[in-house]
């Protein structure tokens, strides 16, 4: 493309790869004026020579890094969910066609983009993901120990604590039923279990320390059922929450609202959508379960009368989901208003 055409550039799409980026750009008439492949290390030097414009990229690995880098250069980066770029793909799938689709999607006026995360948010998100992986691995290790014991005809009561308390007694008292090799295997798995416990405890402690130093986390933890994990997880996911105009938008993003399938003026609602962050939604649902387990505390909360009313006429699982939705909406209101939760004031919930 000529130098003259490049000066008319209004939008660029980047298909981000591990080592190579593919760029496609359009001018204000929709004419293709840029089609280029660059190395990752040449990102800054390449964009320094381009006119400042909208730069779209899919929400993928390193998208936030690329976005921050381009913003420093004066561009307007837009991180787009992959499902929003798919309708713009023409022809076969290749890197240039993907970049072209991203460039076209980035020009849409009502496009819902992913909010750019700060480095602190990414660090906090990484901590949560490490902890989540460790917890999953610990669960898998415990289940494998149980499976090997069942293969020997030995069953243990449900729960990790029950297995921990009885494992060595089983290995000692029923040594005739367990071969020496199997005993060594189970001992090795138990050592893995102890190591994972230590890693999880250390990671959880680090998250708790961060929650005590972060003002937004402190205010979020004034909400019933919300502790260090939810507060830091929410800050890592949405920052100050200003990407949403109201609390119900945040609840919808979190997937805690009914799926809508309406046509012909008839509204049909189904199960919850389960969109957005599965991890954060799970934490809010777990918080709702904890509150449901302690009905003696309900009168202390501003939403206590509502909770007593719905729990008397709906299935418990529906009540838990509705309560998780309410907690998420309260959390967004707390995050954006700069206030703390008032046990006896319901105005924050209504936003």
Where are these predicted regions, by residue range?
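Glycine-rich, often acidic, oxyanion-interacting loops/wings at catalytic, nucleic-acid
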Residues: 129-219
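Acidic beta-strand-to-loop metal/phosphate-binding motif
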Residues: 53-60, 102
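Nucleic-acid-processing active sites and adjacent nucleic-acid-binding tracks
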Residues: 27-53
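Short alpha-helix plus adjacent loop in nuclease-associated cores
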Residues: 78-126, 167, 172, 266-275, ...
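Extended, structured, electrostatic nucleic-acid-contact surfaces
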Residues: 2-9, 201-226, 234-240
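Phosphate-backbone recognition surface of nucleic-acid-processing proteins
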Residues: 88, 219-316, 351
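Gly/Thr-rich phosphate-binding beta-strand-loop-beta motif of the actin/hexokinase/Hsp70
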Residues: 6-26, 102
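Low-complexity, acidic/Ser/Thr- and charged residue-rich accessory regions of DNA metabolism proteins
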Residues: 265, 305-351
């Amino acid at each position: 493309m000529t130098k003259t055409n490049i000066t008319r550039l209004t939008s660029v799409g980047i298909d981000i790869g591990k080592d190579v980026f593919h760029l496609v750009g359009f001018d204000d008439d929709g004419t293709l004026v840029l089609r280029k492949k660059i190395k990752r290390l040449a990102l800054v030097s390449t964009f320094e020579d381009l006119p400042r414009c909208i730069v779209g990229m899919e929400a993928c690995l390193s998208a936030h890094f690329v976005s921050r880098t381009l913003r420093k250069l004066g561009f307007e980066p837009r991180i787009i969910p992959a499902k929003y770029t798919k309708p713009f793909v023409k022809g076969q799938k290749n890197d240039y066609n993907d970049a072209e689709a991203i460039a076209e999607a980035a020009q849409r006026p009502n496009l819902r983009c992913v909010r750019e995360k700060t480095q602190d948010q990414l660090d906090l998100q990484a901590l949560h993901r490490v902890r989540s992986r460790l917890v999953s691995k610990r669960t898998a290790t415990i289940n494998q120990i149980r499976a090997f014991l069942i293969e020997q005809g030995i069953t243990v009561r449900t729960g990790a604590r029950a297995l921990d308390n009885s494992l060595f007694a089983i290995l000692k008292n029923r040594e005739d039923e367990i071969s020496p090799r199997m005993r060594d295997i189970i001992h090795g798995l138990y050592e893995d279990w102890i190591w994972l416990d230590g890693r999880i405890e250390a990671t959880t402690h680090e998250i708790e320390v961060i929650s005590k130093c972060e003002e937004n986390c402190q205010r979020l933890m004034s909400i019933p059922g919300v502790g260090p994990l939810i507060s830091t997880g929410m800050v890592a996911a949405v920052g100050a929450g200003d990407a949403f105009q109201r609390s119900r938008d945040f609840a919808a993003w979190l997937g805690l609202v009914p799926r809508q399938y309406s046509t012909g003026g008839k509204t049909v609602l189904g199960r919850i959508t389960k969109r957005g962050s599965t991890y954060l939604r799970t934490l809010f649902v777990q918080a709702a379960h904890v509150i449901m387990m302690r009905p003696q505390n309900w009168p202390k909360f501003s939403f206590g009368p509502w909770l007593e009313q719905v729990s008397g006429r709906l299935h418990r699982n529906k009540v838990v989901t509705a309560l998780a939705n309410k907690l998420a909406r309260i959390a967004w209101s707390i995050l954006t208003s700069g206030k703390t939760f008032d046990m006896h004031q319901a105005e924050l919930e209504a936003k």
